[in-house]
Amino acid sequence: MSAKSRTHWIDRWEPEDPQFWESRGKRIARRNLIFSIFAENIGFSIWVLWTIVVINLANAGIEMSLSEQFWLTALPNLIGSFLRIPYTFAVPRFGGRLWTTISASLLMIPCLLLAVVVPSGWLAEQGHDTQFWVLLGCAATAGFGGGNFSSSMSNISFFYPESRKGLALGLNAAGGNLGVAITQLLVPLVVIIGVPTAAVKLPEHEVHLAYAGLMWMPFVVLAAFCAWRYMDSLTQAKSDKTAYVKALGNGQTWIVSLLYIGTFGSFIGYSFVLPLVIKNTFPEFLAGHPFIATYLAGLGFMGALIGSAARPLGGWLSDRLGGAPVTLWCFLGMGAFTALAILGVEDHSFPVFFGAFMAIFLLAGMGNGSTYRMIPSIFAELGRRDAGAGRIDPAAAEVAFKRRAAAAIGIAGAIGAFGGFLIQVVLRQASLGVTALVGAAETPAAKLAVARAHADWSVPALWIFFSAYFVLAGMTWFFYLRRDLAGERKPTPVRAT
């Protein structure tokens, strides 16, 4: 491969050839993986940026109700989920190098809007409704960061042989997911740079929201530059539209997508809302612990950190125990710990609530890995069944169903992200009652008293999530693990091992 080709397209790419892989393929793939992870990490960081912005709006002089704050975090989640669909097809259309450069460059838009528009004097002079719609438009652009996941995963999958794709995609996904924790850890510290320490300890203090946008701009430029300078495009990286149509028409794709709504949807949904939920559920605890309240955003970043680190663990356990059993136990555990979180809210115990949610993040992260591990196994079994029934040649079945599995992974990734939006919508609906009561209170002290008296506003939403996890556990058992009375596995489910 010539030096010139490093900045253009690679025509010959044979990762399944051991000699090619060891002599040049491994080095090229590793380089592309490194810069793909970097760009995806920045994408996730900006996708969840408004999770920290919303809890600091009041300190910036912009008052939004709790239900309005939920919209400001939910819309980036929704936009990012929609963008995952076209982003999946962008790599074959534009090439991995060019599209990674473009998608990274688009991240400059939400950064600029946050740095220039949100803290501007013009916005401060507007009426409440105008402020809300302007903020909603600015927040929506953060959704660009959510689409990066699908194109990044699609691009990297072409570079690695089948035997190494699992680890490569796991590292790519986990590296991107860590961007959530990075944002929720660093941005609260950055927005109070220059604010006196004594002032920061007060419930209301000065913040510099512009810094939340400015801090990412150099990294956006660096990600785009590195993608253009060091990444490659493969001429053979073509999308198989037939495989996508076949995958969309297969019921197994939709079943696994529902399961992924429960795992990844929980991870990203709780990542978006946990700082906001903590702030509005445990005001007394945060008032007594200003360091946690201000510097660490209520420790919300820890959930994203744990969930990101747990994803490879879920894949590793699935390799040994099977994807379906691991997924089943993850859902059962998430349901149990949701019940514990409800107990924490009702008893006004932040440690119980927080510990329960850290366990939920752990299990959701593991479930992300185990659910993705199920998809190739399911479609491989479907291919063997078709071949065994004489409907297709075994060799052709292996190739065709492997492509359908790849398509199903992309579809599940897009659909699963919508789960995060659903979680935020449910929590927003649960908050409407307390929002109305707070709005009716006449003085700031009365508003605070009402909010504290109704700090258990999230309990109805948590009961819905509790029920959903057990429904998803039942689906996992019914479709992939159930046996008949004689102890034989039912013929209709596919064992996802």
What is each residue range found by the language model?
Residues 25-53, 253-269, 358, 362:
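Pair of pore-lining "gating" transmembrane helices in MFS-fold secondary transporters
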Residues 71-89, 301-314:
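Central cavity-lining transmembrane alpha-helices of secondary-active solute carriers
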Residues 146, 166-192, 409-423:
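Glycine-rich segments within core transmembrane alpha-helices of 12-TM secondary carriers
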Residues 50-55, 250-308, 368, 372, ...:
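Extracytoplasmic gate region of multi-pass secondary transporters
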Residues 172-228:
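Helix-loop-helix hairpin linking two adjacent transmembrane segments in secondary transporters
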Residues 216-237, 473-480:
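C-terminal membrane-cytosol helix-exit motif in multi-pass small-molecule transporters
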Residues 105-128, 332-348:
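C-terminal ends and interior cores of transmembrane alpha-helices
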Residues 321-371:
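C-terminal transmembrane helical hairpin of 12-TM major facilitator-type secondary transporters
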